[in-house]
Amino acid sequence: MAITPNGFIAKKDDSSDFLTKKESQSYVATVLKAGALVIGRRTYGVLSKQSEFQKFLKAKIKIAIVSKHSMNIKSPYHKVANSPQSALNFLKGSKEIVVAGGGLLNASFMSENLVDEIYIDIEPNLFSEGIKLFEGGSFDVKLKLLGTRMLSKNEIQLHYKVLK
């Protein structure tokens, strides 16, 4: 998941215009490799307007949208789930599942101890207000660094294992 050095995954208005093309390519490759994605309602709304979304539709990526509200979904491979566990039940059988926000959803997965690994792509931008990587929730998690990878001369990916 892309974040700024000060911990934001999106601007206050849900904009992610600070993300680089390299980051977008990394995100798409990760989701296509995994084959399954969990996102929140607002993230689904933003993602469905981006060109990357067409690649997910074409590849028949299973997407669980965690929301308490009913919504118009774009594919029979997408489903609204009312909880993190319900989302995982829908995606059962997937070899990997990417959880990609927003901050409330990320925090709920961490609070319910449902995360095994975290990939954080640090983007070279700072802004003072926005959506944090984790919004709310109650957790205290230790991590072990598994590796780092340069995405570009200004972007680095950190790969952590969640210690349970």
Language model features with spans:
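Enzymes that bind and transform nitrogen-containing heteroaromatic metabolites
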Residues: 1-164
